[in-house]
């Protein structure tokens, strides 16, 4: 985000987010999760808003399928989804989610602008790769779940929370940030159920 705010990729034009879990959760979790869009995609809605900054998302189109999990079907939830959104300034955002990625916890972000592109890719325990005249050897599998993938981020968040409490500071994340991500999730469900793009009302 800092690179985007500093103009390193020029004028922002597209955001592409991939977020896929390694395997579906159990049925008891699904019953209490509030639906795929409010459980999983809500983090991607929040991330999109964070990257966009003062450019709010004004329109959302959502598509969902039941392709993977019998438990999802049983509770009437989706396990595969895609979203196209548009910001007030015309930036287009694509999000794709899945409850199953057999190769691990797939988390990628791309921002594309008038001067270039930046990508945050998947992380592996090791970045070592081997090349010889026969073939290119695959590197280690990506992290399997969010605990491993975001271990450092959780530590940083806890440190930031302690610092806020100890120094009586205002947190950088507000109630409105969470509320607006939920508004986007609800608008996405409206789009899915109505079969049309929905304007977002905050």
What annotation goes with each model-predicted range?
Residues 44-45, 155-159, 185:
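A general structural signal for well-ordered alpha-helical segments in protein cores
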Residues 24-92, 96-103, 176:
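Rossmann-like dinucleotide-binding domain that binds NAD(P)(H)
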